[in-house]
Amino acid sequence: AISDQLTLNPLFMALYLSNAYIPGRGTFYQEIDTLASGTFAIYDWLTDDLQMISQPNMRFVEPLAGRAEKKRLNELVETFMDVCVSYRTKLPKLLSLSGGMDSRCVAGALQQKSIDFVPISFLDFQKEVKDDVLIASQIAELYHKSHNVIQLSLCEPEHYEKLFYLKAGLNYLPVAMFLQYLEKILAQYPQSALFLTGDGGDKVMRYLLPDKELADEKQWLNYWYSQNAIIPTKDSAAIFGIPEKAMDEYLLNHLSTYPTGNYNYKYASAILAERSARWAFEGEDRNRYFFRSET
């Protein structure tokens, strides 16, 4: 098995335990990684030659100070609408609709552009999301659409095992119930579908800059841990037998690759490039085991 030839890195494991993802990396293994941010690849089919260059500045763009907020908002709306229009396809379009603003915005854009879609939601076994389902039903009624509500049962051990198998532990196990949701949708649409979600909207809809000025790397590090660490780094480091300082040094070294000297923008960029790209991507990748999924 290929796993027998790979090396688990204790530092990466500790970072994952504290952050729920590994900043700047895609796996726990020393030998396997994802492409660096802003990577461009050119492949020559005739010579079987692959060339790659990384230009992080293409991904980490500092906001232009002084521009009117209304103009920025108009640009965001225009871009958002263009993306939604790109989903005009012959595949059935299923919008996983919750009570949140994110998926509601997608629903509004599709409706405005006369792109047909099926609003679909799940009701968990404990009925903890019943208020979300109620709001989603009201939105569906407003748009004169039939709301497909999928009832979930209590998760079985095989759902957790399947999620671990599919994502090798890189997707949070408590979301195993989402596999049941996807399986039931696939049973209704066995010929495939386009599955749309509002995942990641919290990176667009809210203010990403820190609520206080960060003047240096120490302030950045302390603020990052206070806002994002799930498990204290001291505990994560102890579990995997590494110095806590190693985690700090890794994060700061990775942060130094961001093409900006402003620590406030470094923080916002980290939320987009790390939490969004590492955490949200794994859920998106999970969905694509079942059908085409976009967010």
List each language-model region with its residue ranges.
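N-terminal segments that mediate ammonia production and transfer
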Residues: 1-66
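ATP-dependent adenylate-handling active sites, centered on carboxylate activation for C-N bond formation
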Residues: 45-46, 59-267, 277-279, 283-295
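Short alpha-helical scaffolding segments that buttress acidic/His motifs in well-ordered protein cores
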Residues: 13-17, 163-164, 267-272
